[in-house]
Amino acid sequence: MSNNKRLCIMKICITSQGSTLDSQAEERFGRAPFFIIVDTETGSFEALVNQFAGGSGGVGPKAAQLIIAHEVKALVSGMVGGNAREALLAAGIDLYAYRAGGTVRDALDRFNKNALERVA
């Protein structure tokens, strides 16, 4: 991916176990308790509660619609299921893998340094 495209990204989502940048990143997209939405231009963020995390099935596509509604341009997560992946890609959201077991802040730093693998 070209650096020009990365510079255009303004809002990214990082899956999280908590509501702050110092929370542990969550590897599961649909089951993540929180989505941290970061504006890479201003550095501001908001924490969204994933109301679908405890659902019995089909949580990934529902969570994807929540992220899409927030006009995110990239998602940083460990694993994204097939149906959620299709919905996110159809919406033009780039997917990046983060499986380091660190914090949301670490995932964000790696994203900003182009150190994450783009998986789709």
Positions of predicted regions on the chain:
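Short, glycine/polar-rich helix-capping loops at beta-to-alpha or helix-loop-helix junctions
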Residues: V80-E86
